[in-house]
């Protein structure tokens, strides 16, 4: 294909918005043709039995799509919209409400599945956890962070596991001189795949640390607990500091027979399936027919993400997605004149949805 337009590339959720738009517009059109509520038509067509095998390899393992729809409808007072619409019309305004339900395939994998579709690489992820003699932890990951907050979330994972301050955890990524081979950050896979590789490495580190502690404290491995920066024997007052166990691993003066010195482990993780978050978004707008001005009255986002590691980062991701969607729907466009000249070549002409334009939205 030859074109004189400027090159473009995906910046988030490549292909998914277009596919979702098509499906949701079909649902809206069908509801109007059938004379039924768009919400109830969606509800009647939700998948309710799991696991659900799709025609394209993937199997939905679990989901409660009615819950997110009901939550969004309640938060937006969906049933009260006709009254609000009538009130707007009394002022000469036009008011509309729209909803969109989605299911997303995240954590792109497993390698065998994508290989059958023609992928030239495996889609596992790797990690290495290095515990230093003083008890600080260094995590090397193939999942690169470019705004997703890996440094915070990954450090929080280690902090919660061993009871260490996050300042004692260093996340290393993006340096090919240090980090072992990884499959990268895309397809919403850093948490589901990248963090799972870290967890597998942490499991090995914890198991070895407990063996060392059990040997030093003359206790059973099954009785060893690690919490709050201490390694203790359950039901007793016998304990060691986390740093003491780490130092013992490296001095190697008193290790179990046959154990190698050090406290460093690596792991690979190749998931058996994708993960499938889902949700429902409802937007209510008011339009001034005289000027064309659009006001977003409210925007409700109800998402089912499963277990959330850091709610603040996840909420920020949702806010960013809302801003991008609003910008794409109302403002942003690459416009060319009849001679093929790009007329939206600067921020003076290409409108972006900015933080000062964003209002308060509901998120749950």
Regions found by a protein language model. Give the residues of each.
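Cofactor-binding beta-sheet edge motifs in enzyme active sites
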Residues: 1-67, 74-355
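Single conserved hydrophobic/aromatic residue that forms the stacking wall/gate
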Residues: 353-364
């Amino acid at each position: 294909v030859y074109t004189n337009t400027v090159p473009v590339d995906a910046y988030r959720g490549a292909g998914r918005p277009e596919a979702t738009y098509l499906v949701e517009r079909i649902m809206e059109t069908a509801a109007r043709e059938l004379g039924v509520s768009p919400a109830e038509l969606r509800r009647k067509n939700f998948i309710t039995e799991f696991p659900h095998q799709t025609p394209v390899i993937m199997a939905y393992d679990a989901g409660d799509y009615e819950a997110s729809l009901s939550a969004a409808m309640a938060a937006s007072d969906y049933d009260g919209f006709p009254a609000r619409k009538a009130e707007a019309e009394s002022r000469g305004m036009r008011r509309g409400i729209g909803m969109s339900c989605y299911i997303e395939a995240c954590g792109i994998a497993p390698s065998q599945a994508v290989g059958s579709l023609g992928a030239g690489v495996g889609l596992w992820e790797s990690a290495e956890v290095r515990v230093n003699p003083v008890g600080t932890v260094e995590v090397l990951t193939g999942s690169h962070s470019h705004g997703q907050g890996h440094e915070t979330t990954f450090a929080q994972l280690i902090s919660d596991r061993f009871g260490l301050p996050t300042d004692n955890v260093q996340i290393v990524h993006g340096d090919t001189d240090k980090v072992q081979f990884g499959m990268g950050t895309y397809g919403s896979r850093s948490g589901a795949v990248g963090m799972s590789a870290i967890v597998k490495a942490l499991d090995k580190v914890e198991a070895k640390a407990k063996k060392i502690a059990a040997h030093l404290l003359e206790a059973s491995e099954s009785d060893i607990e690690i919490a709050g920066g201490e390694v203790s024997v359950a039901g007793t007052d016998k304990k060691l500091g986390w740093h003491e166990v780490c130092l013992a691993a490296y001095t190697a003066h008193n290790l179990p027979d046959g154990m190698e010195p050090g406290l460093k482990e690596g792991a690979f993780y190749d998931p058996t399936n994708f993960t499938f978050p889902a949700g429902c978004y409802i937007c209510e707008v008011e339009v001034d027919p005289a000027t064309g001005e659009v006001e977003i009255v409210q925007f409700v986002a109800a998402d089912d993400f499963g277990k959330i590691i850091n709610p603040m980062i996840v909420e920020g991701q949702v806010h960013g997605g809302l801003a991008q969607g609003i910008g794409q729907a109302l403002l942003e466009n690459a416009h060319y004149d009849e001679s093929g000249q790009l007329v939206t070549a600067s921020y003076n002409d290409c409108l972006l949805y900015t933080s000062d334009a964003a209002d308060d939205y509901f998120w749950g």
